[in-house]
Amino acid sequence: MTLPSRSALFKLGCRVCHELPPVERVQVEDHAAELRRNDALFARWAAGYGVIRHDPLTQVRVDAMLRRADEHAQGLDRSGWLGQLIAADRVASAGLWLVAHMTYAREVRRDGRALPAEAFKPMPEGHTGGSLNMVPAYVGYLVANSLSGMTRGWIMGQGHCVAAIDALNLWVGNLHPAHAGRYDLSDAGLSRFVADFYSYAIRSDGTPASPLGSHVNAHTVGGVSEGGYLGFAELLWPHMPLHGERLVAFLSDGAFEEQRGSDWAPRWWRATDCGLAVPIMILNGRRIEQRSNIEQAGGERWLHRHLRLNGFEPIGLDGRDPASFAWGILEIETRQQAQVGSDHPSAESARLGYGIAEAPKGFGFPGAGGNRAHNLPLEGNPASDTAAREAFNTAAQHLWVAPAELDAALAALTTHASQGRARERDHAMATRNVALPRLPVPDWKKVGTSSSPMAALDEYVLQVVRENPQLRPRTGNPDELRSNKFDRTLDALKHRVTFPEHGVAEARDGAVITALNEEAVICAALGNKGGINLAVTYEAFGVKMLGALRQEIIVARHLTEAGRPPGWLSVPVLLTSHTWENAKNEQSHQDPTLVEALLGEMADTSSVGFPVDANSALAMLRACYASHGRIVALVVPKREVVTRLTGEQSACLAVNGAAVVHGDPRAAQALLVAIGAYQLEQALQAADRLDEHQMRTAVICLGEPARLRQPRDAHEAPFTLDDTALSALFPTTVPWCSCSMRAAPWWQSSCCRSAC
């Protein structure tokens, strides 16, 4: 038997046999036919199931994978692997079947009987096409885990495709308590499951009645990102797995055009300090209303050229076939493992594998490949349209798997106990629990001296990083560290680059992720949840980070509400060269939008601080690193300012959000409230003038305004001052005047209780 050359397996990253050059195509087809003739079990798998077919190229690739089985088998031989691949086809078909029901049906019949009109939803909803495309992808991920005996993490950029994840996790029993207590595999349990999807029902307290969401949520097993903001998963994934961990990133071709920076991963990923990370784009060629830009520019072949220019090795996958996904995951990992111990960035072998899984949008159901596939692929509503109902029932019959056959397939893929590995719900990136770092006592500045708060933070960040070598550091930097007084951190951690420039603070293993793209660099910090992180930017440019930050805030809050609070170290975002320091660059560089938006979020997950000197900045940063699961924005002066607070006062300010820096509020005739360093200086000058005129004043430094608000729920309450603490600062009989960094008219009313 003559085996196809390796070039035939990878030629131009072909996904199916007909894309190969003629000679190699014949070679692969002949070899696949011989494999089927000589191995009955292989032939049974190769025959496919329902709408799932295995192209000859996939067959040959899978055979090559099986020949390496001894390296990965974890107790399985060739027949065991083939048995799992056969099972995967049945599970994928059942997944397609259930996803279609989630969109259209409110009743499920496991015996496969046709549904009558009353069994359908009067108002179907579902992002169906993308969800159908994700079914073979996620099954391929499950099979790769089972075949290799290793549980990988996953992230999905197209969060609206969550129906695929939830449906398959229900089939395989990979559930969190909210799903396990509500759904099962009976007709009644499955009917409740599909009826809950897009039900919009709410409880008396205003929370959703259904744990199913339109996007990845806290109950989506293994979910780490909502995926509602297209493009951020594409920026997060290379920074997510720690060395020794594994991740599969399912990416969107629509997000590829949405977000700059998704093709920069080869600049950041290194075999030396990153875990194995497999990016796979679901290339279905369509946005909501038209073809994607990739499709318009030339499709898969254009994308291959683009990716190679950016340091990737494109590998074509059949997006209709779970076996192709499983092979792609294991193949890309094998190529990455070959880089361990090697440092030859110019070598072809250093390219980062990138799977391109092409399939018609909505594969497996009527309407595939057209605009309708995005949401509701049928031409009518089966609840009221006979033709649409017949189309649904006919398509569902092709996807249906007999219960006994499906149960056997599900059992074949449930190998966690025998392999001693975690369930997919418990993968490393979904269960981060980072121990609080060692935080040295800061070098407190002497009251009355002048210093740059940013320079003080620079010194302290470096101390913390050196005290905690077990934590991988990442600093997100839109090319401003030196101008923002972070020289020491940059010199020690260095820009991460492919080819370092002599005499510049650059290194291949640098920990500073620098790009003139705020979304890309903030995602470096947000993705590194197993490490310690920081982002530094001009305040005005921070608003470009808002979408990514808000996604993290939402997910963290929902996890807390679900009883699984996030265990990653809180992430500080230093906003400097701020509104009161950047007048030289006109109003475009004086933009307080980010902090105004973050102040609207819940204070337990989103903190906005206004340090007034070096000591208060140090205390707030230290408090940030001593907490979990929060985004902490600090508006920090970079110019020298007078140190007003002692270390002890600063620590109290970081905890309470407010501190008295002059006078006694209970004895005062007027209170001056300052938010910000420059505002405090003016408030103190005003207090001196008023004192000279025999008007007793007290000056209160408000370091975290949200501490003064009326808590909006029980989770936020511990992060706000109680009435006793509030009245000690703001006696109700004393008038007060605020000197704020913000001119927005809603500032005081949104941050402070009316009792103030």
Which sequence ranges carry the predicted segments?
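Acidic/histidine-rich catalytic neighborhood of metal-dependent amide-processing enzymes
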Residues: 256-268, 549-557, 618
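Active-site nucleophile and cofactor-binding loops and adjacent substrate-binding regions
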Residues: 119-135, 154-161, 207-226, 252-255, ...
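N-terminal amphipathic, basic-rich helices that act as targeting or association modules
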Residues: 2-172, 453-458, 462, 477
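A glycine-rich helix N-cap at a beta->alpha junction
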Residues: 175-190, 269-280, 309, 503-506, ...
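Thiamine diphosphate
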Residues: 193-211, 217, 222-226, 240-248, ...
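Alpha-helical support elements that line or immediately flank enzyme active sites
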Residues: 172-176, 475, 680
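Non-catalytic terminal/interface segments that mediate subunit docking, oligomerization
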Residues: 85-90, 100-109, 154, 410-568, ...
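Cofactor-binding active-site loop characterized by glycine-rich and histidine/acidic residues
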Residues: 84-114, 119-272, 487-489, 519-528, ...
